[in-house]
From Swiss-Prot:
Major subcellular site: nucleus
Modified residues (N-acetylglycine): G2
Protein name, per record: Metal regulatory transcription factor 1
Motif Nuclear localization signal in this chain: 133-138
Protein task: Zinc-dependent transcriptional regulator of cellular adaption to conditions of exposure to heavy metals. Binds to metal responsive elements (MRE) in promoters and activates the transcription of metallothionein genes like metallothionein-2/MT2A. Also regulates the expression of metalloproteases in response to intracellular zinc and functions as a catabolic regulator of cartilages.
Superkingdom of source: Eukaryota
Keywords carried by this UniProt record: Acetylation, Activator, Cytoplasm, DNA-binding, Metal-binding, Nucleus, Phosphoprotein, Repeat, Transcription, Transcription regulation, Zinc, Zinc-finger
One Pfam family named in its UniProt record: zf-C2H2
Biased composition (Polar residues): 408-417, 700-712
SMART domains: ZnF_C2H2
Compartment(s): Nucleus; Cytoplasm
């Protein structure tokens, strides 16, 4: 600034403001030779006069007047002093320092000629008593009635008085803004908010922060120097970078509320001025904050309310929306609600991770091992999940869930093992083709849906029960490839109304999975099958000594369902999309919209053979939902007739006498099953095997491989899931623990029979 001045003096000037420390408030002058005006360093009086070119230079936004932002600051360097605020170089100064041995007077007109019409000057007086060394600064009192505000400079007082007169004459011309300010400088600073300009950068090594005003930079630098404003109240350790913020905080201890609303006798008082401004808008109806989103015309009285509203737009923009666009109600796009996002992964994510999986093929895993792992005591080892998968899903679902619990990272490879189960909701509409998909890893029972439209039936759908996470036996090591078990989209196939899964004779897990989840391509002949039974051998387990086999059948009991999955009919069809083994029609597949299939994965640790590291396996259980007409759910002759027809069919297919009849699905319309052969893997190109026909399957059910296959074969699916039947108490304590809150939930079926 002194570059063009007559005496070539360079001035080191710091603003006189309340937010500066006493050392910062000292005005220091050094000539170009670096000589201090007083040899003793003692200063009796300093006076600074700032010649202003425009009326007022700073809007008083804070309670105590953050002044001095408009002043030109000169900061010291190793080779001298240089000017920071180039916008204020045209302003002139008259300054003098009174010391014991000299009086130093400096007149600096600025880098440009002094203005002819000087509209005002800011006078700062700071005195130091020679005896006590105390510094005293004159305060300027506001003369408006009832206003207690004081300022250290006359210019700041004058700016403050404009607020009483409402002289907000400097208006922002940025599109959609329209804010007005007391001074031109305040407007210039505000425009930097729109332009993102931050010319004042922190020079501390490693700190890359920048600010739009020098005042904010100096406040920030106090964090580096440690010269913060600390609260001295007992038990309070808070500190602040500005004196104004400290004074606001102290009012929380004293209870002082100096800002009172005088609107129509309101009388409410506040500790901060901006709280009063916000309150006044409740009287005036002013809503100055507009939502910038396209098509949204909402306005708000506070910036906080606007930010909260904008988060809603952000969440909608980033929400997981893999649902196809239908011509139906738009509400179906948001009807899929997930309770535990950490259990969910998409088809593409599993395919991306498939290259990292190693180990055996699924065809080498026996059904006995699968069921043994499902019911082994979960206390043997800790349950872990893949945090990377959880994090990616949390980001995709950040609009649908509040939080996802953190879990320890897995230390081994992960894989996905698919077990298909059957869910049969009865509908009053005609049967529709099946679209298999993936769903939570739980064997959900079949709810009974009352008559009505499909939309009504799925408007209040049953929830799905999540199973316990159970470790796999120590004697077995699992490693499955995600890509081998990902179902591909295929044209829909009709499904048997009464399909059930029974634990019994031997069959491979892959064959069972495809038998339930993936019908084969249609052949020339079809045969109506009212019911089909597939058996699985169950490994020996101390927990299952009394219940060696498992039968999953439809049940009228829907009270055990917990609300964790809610979906509309169109979303249901999307969830059930494409799990059959081979494509039926390439043209139909090309025309079908490409969507993601969702897998709910529970990671469980697998104890490998001695000397090997522990691996992780994801148990991903697709649930097939079979739509059928309204079925009778009562224990009457119609249910018995269905059992008799199934029994007579088994007799016609095999000579051995039938075993104890297991509960069958309620009688419904006979659906045509195109073929009785099923692929062992749903992905083309993988190894496949052919399941026996329904006669052979029945024969397998009649010859169980374990002597313990007697009691559980007739277990109802409600008893299997809840294991809290009043008649048959269960020994499977880990699964019972999941249902302890069932009665508290007060869940009742909302579907009429």
């Amino acid at each position: 600034m002194g570059e063009h001045s007559p005496d070539n003096n360079i001035i080191y000037f710091e603003a006189e403001e309340d937010e500066l420390t006493p050392d910062d408030k000292m005005l220091r002058f050094v000539d170009k030779n670096g000589l201090v005006p007083s040899s003793s360093g003692t200063v009796y009086d300093r006076t600074t006069v700032l010649i202003e070119q425009d009326p007022g230079t700073l809007e008083d936004e804070d309670d105590d007047g953050q002044c001095g932002e408009h002043l030109p600051f000169l900061v010291g360097g190793e080779e001298g002093f240089h000017l920071i605020d180039h916008e204020a170089m045209s302003q002139g100064y008259v300054q003098h320092i009174i010391s014991p041995d000299q009086i130093h007077l400096t007149i600096n007109p600025g880098s440009t000629p002094m203005p002819r019409n000087i509209e005002g000057a800011t006078l700062t007086l700071q005195s130091e008593c020679p005896e006590t060394k105390r510094k005293e600064v004159k305060r300027y009192q506001c003369t408006f009635e009832g206003c207690p505000r004081t300022y250290s400079t006359a210019g700041n007082l004058r700016t403050h008085q404009k607020t009483h007169r409402g002289e907000y004459t400097f208006v922002c011309n940025q599109e959609g803004c329209g804010k007005a300010f007391l001074t031109s400088y305040s407007l210039r600073i505000h425009v930097r908010v729109h332009t993102k300009e931050k010319p004042f950068e922190c020079d501390v090594q490693g700190c890359e922060k920048a600010f739009n005003t020098l005042y904010r930079l100096k406040a920030h630098q106090r964090l580096h120097t440690g010269k913060t404003f600390n609260c001295e109240s007992e038990g309070c350790s808070k500190y602040f970078t500005t004196l104004s913020d400290l004074r606001k905080h102290i009012r929380t201890h004293t209870g002082e509320k100096p800002f009172r609303c005088d609107h129509d006798g309101c009388g409410k008082a506040f500790a901060a001025s901006h709280h009063l401004k916000t309150h006044v808008r409740t009287h005036t109806g002013e809503r100055p904050f507009f939502c910038p989103s396209n098509g949204c015309e909402k306005t708000f009285s506070t910036q906080y309310s606007l930010k909260s509203h904008m988060k809603g737009h952000d969440n909608k923009g980033h929400s997981y929306n893999a649902l196809p666009q239908h011509n139906g109600s738009e509400d179906t796009n948001h009807s899929l609600c997930l309770s535990d996002l950490s259990l969910l992964s998409t088809d593409s994510e599993l395919r991306e991770n498939s290259s990292t999986t190693q180990g055996q093929d699924l065809s080498t895993i026996s059904p006995a091992i699968i069921f043994e792992s499902m019911f082994q005591n979960s206390d043997d080892t800790a349950i872990q999940e893949d945090p990377q998968q959880t994090a990616s899903l949390t980001e995709s679902f950040n609009g649908d869930a509040e939080s996802v619990s953190d879990v320890p990272p897995s230390t081994g490879n992960s894989a996905s093992l698919s077990l298909p189960l059957v869910l049969q909701p009865g509908l009053s509409e005609p049967p529709q083709p099946l679209l298999p998909a993936s769903a939570p890893s739980a064997p959900p029972p079949a709810p009974s849906l009352g008559p009505g439209s499909q939309q009504a039936a799925f408007g209040n759908p049953p929830a799905l029960l999540q199973p316990p996470e159970v470790p796999v036996p120590h004697s077995t090591q699992f490693a499955a490839n995600h890509q081998e078990f990902l179902p591909h989209p295929q044209a829909p196939q009709p499904i048997v109304p009464g399909l059930s899964v029974v634990a019994g004779a031997s069959a491979s897990a892959a064959a069972v999975a495809s038998a339930v989840a993936a019908p084969a391509p249609p052949q020339s002949t079809t045969e109506p099958l009212p019911a089909m039974v597939q058996t699985l051998p169950l490994g020996a387990n101390s927990v299952l000594t009394n219940n060696p086999t498992i039968t999953i059948t439809p049940t009228p009991n829907t009270a055990i369902l917990q609300s964790s999955l809610v979906m509309g009919e169109q979303n249901l069809q999307w969830i059930l999309n494409g799990a059959t083994s081979s494509p039926q029609n390439q043209e139909q597949i090309q025309q079908a919209s490409k969507v993601e299939k969702v897998f709910f994965t529970t990671a469980v640790p697998v104890a490998s053979s001695p000397g090997s590291s522990v691996q992780q396996i994801g148990l991903s259980v697709p649930v097939i939902i079979i739509k059928q007409e309204e079925a009778c759910q009562c224990q009457c002759a119609c249910r018995d007739s269905a059992k008799e027809r199934a029994s007579s069919r088994r007799k016609g297919c095999s000579s051995p006498p039938p075993p104890e009849p297991s509960p069958q699905a309620p009688d419904g319309p006979s659906l045509q099953l195109p073929a009785q052969t099923f692929s062992s893997a749903p992905v083309p190109g993988s190894s496949s095997s052919t399941l026996p026909s329904s006669c052979e399957q029945s024969r397998q059910a009649e010859t169980p491989s374990d002597p313990q296959t007697e009691t559980l074969s007739a277990m109802d699916v409600s008893e299997f899931l809840s294991l809290q039947s009043l008649d048959t108490p269960s020994n499977l304590i880990p699964i019972e623990a999941l249902l302890q809150g069932e009665e508290e939930m007060g869940l009742t079926s909302s579907f009429s029979k």
